[in-house]
């Protein structure tokens, strides 16, 4: 019996245990403590005492009874979950219950009894304050019960009244900060009385409610009853729990849980709606009951198996969830009644004693229910033996390690079995409620079971809007049904999984037990002169093919071919292939196709594995192999007719072996029998009515099993097979020729080929071709848009989706495609073909419920014989079901739909399909690892279903040849750096004295502040919790307080005593003022400038104000945004200058040692550029002399980045980027293995976990890389009382040791262990810098790693795998990421692959490609006055603005003839959209001249279109808007940005880098101003939507994400509607701060203000009042005339009277001068006004899909209650879900990084709030 079981036994027998003065005490009912249990208690005495004393003892604090105290972790979670900002939040943790009371209940007496309860129980007088504290009010007024007198109502009316009360209360969310929180109500009818209780569980839990109801009833029945006074309080209990967190027991439990954390599974993967409503706050209650007899029977059966009834109920719940979870391993969230025996009266106290515990379940483990129940029970008891580290703590740690969302564990099990009744004891037992429902934040499903009312009450509360229709009911019925079976049947406990009744095994079709070539032979005899096949050389009849095959057969038989033998075929696509396979099969042998285009090494592997006796090929392709080679083109046909009959074969003889990609790195041969394949051929021919009138286009290669049907299925029906010319086999225009020439009736291909054909034909709209009557697509996902596009051209084609596996005779499942299927997420997989079965089974072989993902298994007559020469793999994939059937595990995932058909969901293993080719990733990995320098390799799949590509990652071995001794180089660099430190430091004694004086001043200030807590006046030690409460220290600052207390200990102010501290009697007496004066008097100004001293003093003297939030630490350091204090701290001091020069000299020495090497530098936490200035200045001469340097300056703050861009604008080799050291290092745009020198000045210490940071940074370092780091190397008290207030708490050994900084030795240890092979410090011990606590640290890393270019490796692999298997990306990593269980983390690799690689690879400026780029580059340099710019330089990134770009366009039109052909505003928009010389050159090359209409196809010669996009010219007569702009190339679904009111993409510039995400980023911008203005305003948005949708559609896009800001949101809405009509899928529609103006604007002043604000002009300088004042005036005017803002409505505001002058000021500011570009600026203004007028149109027709609305949290000063107005408008604009999200900023400045992060989340997780 474990300790947990022993405690549970005591609890079940109502035995109370507690410790007292080191002794074990107990209180037990008569007879409860028998001899055996007493002996167990004695044996476990020490363990019990350790458990009971696991935290501090009980401490009653009656004098603090009415002081606020903290929330428990669960209470805090409940309060936080009330916030609607969280998914699945926005509701209280609340129970609503109704109880029947006698009809004659006296309301006054019941009210008096209630108030007696309020007086007795403090938590009935409690409130929540500031969402973080709870407080018991000392006195409260008499609480009146709400009484509904309904005696005059009949039964129906009374029931209607009860429904109204229930509707009001059952989801109530009480105000926790207002007493009373609990407000019972009473409804008194004619013959009934009902008590309504809406209880917020934040204050009292379910067990407390039962105690309360029992005492309340008892007091009502006996008003004289008085319970013994309560000496224990919930507040005292919380105090114990708070102190317990400092105990060894808490640390032990924490270590135990964290050791398991990485292995814990996630939440149950239950099927959810396509768009679950994450904002829903409504729940539905399900209830069932086992009567007392059934419950006792279940308990008895549980006992027979050594289980408790409560454990069985939990196991049954886990079993049910496991049945419906798509992941077999998951965590359940258990609510635990946490009332430890800390005090004898604690069982009578009301409060929320709830704790949470995560229970890991793996539903695959255990062959019977009993085994699984035992395993769950054992795990639960293990968990409950470590209770002090709470489930909430664990969830927080999960979120920290795995990211946001990992802490959502929404499936809850709440058991009151035994525990509630034990708690109630012999008291008044409450009655069962007549109705009950509960809600909990962040919970999807809460299962509650209790036996307190006799029998077992079963309740589920399920959040609405999440699960598909009917699923919750089905799950609940499964659970209840399982409990009933366990109560009734002994077999339910011990039998394995009961399988569903199995239908009879599928039967083969009559006539299918024959050779697959028999049908061809019959047709050859029946119609010998009919055409059998066409190829590039001509046509051949059945007779000709048969005669040639007969000749080949004779030769092959001479070489040993016959039954049981195999012959390889290696021929190009031609009629010879059909001849070869017929001849081989006529000989009784099996054929083995070998693709002639495959690399020689792979061909050799296939031939060796297949053990062929002969090879059929062309004379020109005879390979050097160990078998006979027969040149088919040298054989003459047999003249005899009819040919001899085929050799006899059995139905189960081998027909062919097709090799597919193999998981072991070598191809695997799939062996198919004649009977298996013949069944499929016969079914397809009958199903689709194939006959001699059909012509099949044979696109599939012979090595792809679709060709089996082309050659044997089609010819068996007498059809003709048409083969493409192998030289044009991938050319869709050639396929179109064949369609036309041969009138193809049957199309059989992978979907990608069908899409290629349609893509081509849509670029040739005038070409009309006959279409196939029947289309078979298989082998890969079918894009849902493809059928619609196909039907648009050939509406009479019957389309079919087929699926299966090479291991199961070509196809096994079929789905006729209907128009409604194109509206789904994917085309359904369908139902099994005849003679076959296709099932979705879970990990235990059970048929999955509808909607639950499982593995697809194929059975029936079509199964392969196995894999050639590989019995082990055959046994792994071809399995026996428990019912005896042989099944093939496909590795494909699927689920049943409601109608019983199957939906395909992808793969579960490392096998993928790329454009129809089945690829084992392991084979590619093996080819990569064959390179002698590659150690490990891993490949992942990128992209959506039909746009997939591969990304491979490798790690390298150590280099074979040893180079220079790394120590020699390190020492040489150290010496160079040390020389740079030499200077006149003055007296070292004086420096040491100043450092000591500074420490004393800081400690004196700390002690003075701490005195306010009463610490120095207290005679007893004060612990940390007490100090935090008295000083108002938040939990986040407790670690800093611990550090300060330690420093004061060392300074002689305090001494530690137990868990607290006492003031020292002989502590330093120096006042803070005197101490700071003393320091200022001895501090050398060269080291501590006066401004720095003043800052340190001010910060130390205002600690209380800073901690309370009254003074901002950042504002102290950067007063009014000035960096002068930071300059004094980081740049001006003599020590700072010396340290930075040492860093610079070290880096120069490193570069000079290998001048031919390209050096990529990454500076972390560059901040004010204090070190960067010196380093860059030192490197600049080296760059000028030819050194190739790429310097990336990074910081987490945009403030510092902006300043650095300006400072280093003259250094084109210096780039800038945001980098967060505490974020995911591999998710910030810096590619792994790409940094040669990493430098940092004083920043690494700011990391939360510096060793982990160094380990992560190592991933970024290339082979033979360097680290150059400057850091603080002792405790700096001046930092602890200043900048530490802006720093987060460290999580490494600094936290354990209560330090802020570490010494040089620790830094070197970290570097040696994590970041460098060799490391050293530069500063000599005892020197001035050492006394000051600084050092420069050098490390040389990865000297044992090889250098290998990806291009070299790719060329190596190309010789070993087919081209379709080559990775699109190939990257070198330091190590492959692994999951917690040691497996390669492919999710992390996919994240790496989606990161841009350009940041550290393209540092060298590219030369202009032609004269146009050269001319534009010259203009760029001239206008920006920067001769070092390159053709990829962003105009705005180099310091440009709207004025300068207008000047650039003006000069461009003066100097370039090609530019003069376009109007100014078109050129301006192009430049705004693509603001680089190369980007603008692309537009000029591809654009038509004025008046000619666009020609997007011309762009093909300049740059490739984005992935998934095929550019095509518009039809003749199309409006010349040419709106489509390519912003960022990439792969995947493009994101399209829709222009705002100016017609440009300028506002989106802050988002471009963040939104690239490795996928295409396109823009829609106004191309022709006149055409834009010609559209009536009331029709503008709809018209633009149609035109833009047409442009996107004609560009070949079939799936997009749309983003519209401001008025662009309205255009985006219309574009989305039109795209859907054209069959283009709008995956996401994102609207940002877009407002339809509900009134007409006749006062131009408002338009001018909005125009100026949109351009970013200074509106105050232009004479406008503050935006808030302007908004007030607008609202005042609209109050008079709500439908329009009349002219002159705003004229009374200061500065706005003269409209003409105001307009002139705005337009002049817009163009930059009074005269220049006046026409263009006026056009821009006209465009803007036109867009505004369009925004005043009537509300549009709603969009049928979903959208996301992003609302700026600062609102729009011109629109009151802006968020509410936006939400109202956009909810009405979409029939689908409308997700509402707040983003930082106001309307004019909300397009920032926070918005980019929000946009990155996919729409399927959005829902209506």
Curated annotation (Swiss-Prot):
Any one GO cellular component localisation term in the record: cytoplasm
Catalytic reaction(s) noted: holo-[peptidyl-carrier protein] + L-cysteine + ATP = L-cysteinyl-[peptidyl-carrier protein] + AMP + diphosphate
Phenotype upon gene inactivation: Mutant can still form salicylate and Dha, but is no longer able to synthesize pyochelin.
Role, per record: Involved in the biosynthesis of the siderophore pyochelin. Adenylates L-cysteine and loads it onto its peptidyl carrier domain via a thioester linkage to the phosphopanthetheine moiety. Then forms a peptide bond between the salicyl-thiazolinyl intermediate bound to the second carrier domain of PchE and the cysteine bound to its own peptidyl carrier domain to form the salicyl-thiazolinyl-cysteinyl-S-PCP2 intermediate. It subsequently cyclizes the C-terminal cysteine to form the second thiazoline heterocycle in the salicyl-thiazolinyl-thiazolinyl-S-PCP2 intermediate.
Similarity section: Belongs to the NRP synthetase family.
Residue span of region Condensation/cyclization: 69-490
Keyword entries, A-Z: Ligase, Phosphopantetheine, Phosphoprotein
Cofactor(s) the protein requires to work: pantetheine 4'-phosphate
Gene source species: Pseudomonas aeruginosa (strain ATCC 15692 / DSM 22644 / CIP 104116 / JCM 14847 / LMG 12228 / 1C / PRS 101 / PAO1)
Annotated protein name in UniProt: Pyochelin synthetase PchF
Induction info: Expression of the pchEF operon is strictly dependent on the PchR regulator and is induced by extracellular pyochelin, the end product of the pathway. Repressed by Fur and iron.
Positions of region (Thioesterase): 1584-1797
Record-listed O-(pantetheine 4'-phosphoryl)serine modification sites: 1442
Carrier domain mapped to chain residues: 1407-1488
Protein's pathway: Siderophore biosynthesis
One GO MF term: ligase activity
Domain remark text: Modular protein that contains a condensation/cyclization domain involved in the cyclization of the cysteine, an adenylation domain which activates the cysteine residue into an aminoacyl-AMP ester, a peptidyl carrier protein (PCP2) domain which bears a phosphopantetheinyl arm to attach the activated cysteine and a thioesterase domain (TE) that may release the newly synthesized peptide from the enzyme.
